[in-house]
């Protein structure tokens, strides 16, 4: 009877998950298409040297070759993709602009390597200008971060091929060959630079040792005094925020806007989006004059978040139903060994020390270990072609080695009487008692669950032209290239998550009174805290000085600091999935393999490919 009740609960949960995926995808699609008034097309075109470029093309109703509309090229930043320009694309297209949201080279579905062909910006503008539905006398460009450098290159090649541009958290001059700006180039420029931007010195700091900036350029508020920005605005005085310099009619207009937001949130803030909309309404003709403050893109993000939650929720009932309903997997259902009883104040002190180490070590060594990839020349290669993923892989492998060493030390000093079975590592004793076939079945179960989750994404992406995402956390459909990359990274990440699961459930699993199990919900919550607390502390260390008017504590580590925003939600998913399947199977493998599949999928499908590999 209990098994039947659990199956009914799983079926109900399955339907809830599927409904969330459907409702989220439908909401995202309705907003993305402005309720059917925008045709969103997933396109490919051939750029420089045969490079296949990927983009989303937003075409408003009524736009034809006989009634062309103004066009805007939108380009994302480093290790992002075309979907993260959705806020700009939605707001501009609903105002009548044809929008090309481009995947930079090596990003999304555009051919690698990253940085090639001026990031793809020149090819993107050339393609937009080739469309007969676009008014070639009314073209704008918007680029976030590295996307700003891409449109800078495009503006340099097509000096009269655009009318205005917006740099979101980006700059001109001295960066990857982007020319220095002045009072006349680029044409009609709006600089949207966050109040708490982490990349001030990179984007606007002086690279000329003979002409250093008069202020500390790691402090965002000092950007108004930057030599390069003042030259861009044609002034020797601090640039005034909000003031329009020059002339729109002459193409020399300039404006600085500084919304209260951080660099990676430039794509998700009404102030940054509104500033871009307002600028194009001032500098381009032919669009609808909908107030810049009237924005609906938030609902698309809410839709894809709902769908993402639905997919994660789906993992639990699918796993439960497969184990209870498919004979091949039934033997994996087992009760976990009793948790270790925490006895007296000494026991609690020992557990708390372990908790501090578990939560603190990954965050403490995050910036150092990821940096070792550069020191050790662990560069992007044919086998491991993603630079940032390489840094993360090296970090987790080193953390895994430390964690395994500490676990073994704890076992031999404090818990020598425990067996491998007590830790969820084996089903018996000795080599044959490990249960090798059950480990294989655990992997096959995890693979089946992940595949079913992937199918929901594939169907949703095909039908709604949206993926599962929120902000920087994304699950994208995998093309052939990214599937190869996924396979390359899967084994190293799986090794780490097996060790993580061993430490989480073998050592850190808390017991209730007299060593009895606590509820699964409480255990999930404890594991979430263990997974993310260290990184929340690291973010506080970095950002409290920045938001207080200074700079990041470790100002040179701005890029890897921004990656943490992707890691924290992933670690929440890790804690939930790992805990659930440990409680269902009594062993660490299904959860470890499943999160390895999910995390490797999320990272590799959404990360930048920096090596020049054959597609």
Put a short name on every predicted segment.
Residues 1-10, 297, 338-345, 432-434:
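Short, Lys/Arg-rich N-terminal segment immediately upstream of the first membrane anchor
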Residues 4-46, 54-56:
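An N-terminal hydrophobic leader/cap segment in hydrolases
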Residues 11-20, 307-311, 353-355, 397-401:
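Hydrophobic H-region at the start of alpha-helical membrane spans
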Residues 25-28, 316-321, 359-368:
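Alpha-helical transmembrane segments of multi-pass membrane proteins
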Residues 39-297:
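Soluble extramembrane regions of membrane proteins in the secretory/endomembrane system
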Residues 294-308:
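Juxtamembrane/start-of-transmembrane alpha-helix segments at the extracytoplasmic/lumenal side
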Residues 311-353:
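Juxtamembrane interface at the cytosolic side of transmembrane helices
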Residues 352-615:
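Alpha-helical transmembrane segments of integral membrane proteins
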């Amino acid at each position: 009877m209990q098994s039947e009740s659990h199956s009914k609960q799983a079926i109900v949960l399955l339907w809830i998950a599927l409904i969330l995926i459907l409702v989220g995808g439908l909401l995202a699609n309705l907003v993305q298409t402005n309720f059917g008034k925008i045709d969103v097309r997933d396109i490919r075109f051939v750029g420089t040297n045969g490079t296949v470029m990927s983009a989303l093309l937003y075409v408003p109703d009524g736009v034809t070759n006989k009634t062309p509309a103004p066009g805007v090229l939108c380009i994302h930043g480093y290790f992002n993709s075309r979907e993260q320009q959705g806020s700009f694309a939605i707001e501009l297209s609903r105002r009548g602009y044809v929008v090309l949201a481009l995947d930079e080279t090596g990003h999304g579905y555009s051919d690698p390597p990253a940085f090639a062909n001026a990031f793809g910006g020149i090819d993107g503008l050339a393609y937009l200008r080739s469309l007969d539905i676009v008014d070639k006398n009314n073209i704008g460009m918007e680029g976030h971060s590295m996307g700003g450098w891409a449109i800078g290159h495009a503006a340099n090649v097509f000096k009269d091929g655009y009318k205005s541009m917006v740099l979101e958290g980006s700059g001109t001059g001295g960066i990857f060959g982007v020319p220095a700006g002045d009072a006349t180039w680029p044409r009609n420029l709006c600089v949207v630079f966050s109040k708490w931007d982490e990349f001030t010195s990179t984007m606007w700091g002086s690279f000329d040792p003979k002409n250093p900036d008069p202020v500390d350029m790691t402090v965002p508020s000092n950007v108004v005094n930057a030599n390069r920005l003042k030259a861009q605005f044609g002034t020797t005085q601090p640039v005034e925020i909000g003031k329009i310099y020059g002339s729109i009619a002459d193409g020399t207009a300039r404006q600085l806007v500084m919304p209260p937001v951080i660099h990676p949130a430039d794509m998700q803030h009404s102030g940054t989006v509104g500033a871009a909309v307002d600028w194009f309404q001032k500098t381009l003709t032919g669009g609808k004059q909908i107030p810049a403050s009237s924005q609906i893109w938030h609902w698309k993000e809410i839709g894809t978040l709902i769908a993402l939650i639905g997919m994660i929720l789906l993992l639990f009932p699918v796993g439960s139903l497969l184990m209870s309903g498919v004979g091949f997997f039934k033997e994996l259902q087992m009760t976990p060994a009793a948790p270790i009883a925490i006895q007296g104040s000494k026991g609690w002190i020992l557990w708390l020390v372990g908790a501090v180490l578990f939560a603190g070590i990954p965050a403490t060594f995050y910036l150092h270990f990821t940096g070792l990839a550069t020191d050790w020349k662990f560069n992007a290669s044919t086998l491991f072609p993603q630079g940032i993923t390489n840094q993360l892989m090296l970090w987790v492998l080193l953390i895994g080695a430390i964690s395994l060493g500490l676990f073994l030390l704890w076992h031999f000093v404090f818990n020598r009487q425990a067996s491998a079975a007590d830790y969820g590592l084996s089903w018996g004793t000795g080599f044959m008692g490990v249960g090798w076939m059950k480990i294989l079945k655990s992997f096959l179960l995890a693979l089946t669950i992940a595949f079913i989750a992937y199918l929901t994404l594939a169907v949703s992406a095909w039908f709604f032209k949206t993926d599962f995402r929120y902000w920087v956390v994304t699950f994208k459909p995998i093309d052939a290239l990214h599937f190869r990359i996924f396979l390359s990274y899967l084994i190293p990440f799986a090794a780490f998550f097996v060790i993580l699961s061993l430490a989480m459930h073998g050592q850190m699993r808390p017991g209730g009174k007299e060593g009895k199990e606590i509820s699964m919900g409480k255990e999930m919550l404890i594991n979430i805290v263990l997974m993310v607390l260290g990184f929340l502390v690291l973010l506080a260390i970095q950002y409290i000085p920045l938001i207080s008017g200074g700079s990041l504590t470790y100002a040179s580590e701005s890029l890897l600091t921004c990656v943490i925003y992707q890691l924290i939600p992933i670690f929440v998913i890790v804690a939930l999935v790992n805990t659930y399947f440990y409680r269902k199977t009594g062993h660490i493998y299904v959860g470890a393999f499943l999160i390895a599949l999910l995390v490797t999928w999320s990272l590799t499908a959404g990360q930048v490919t920096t090596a020049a590999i054959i597609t």
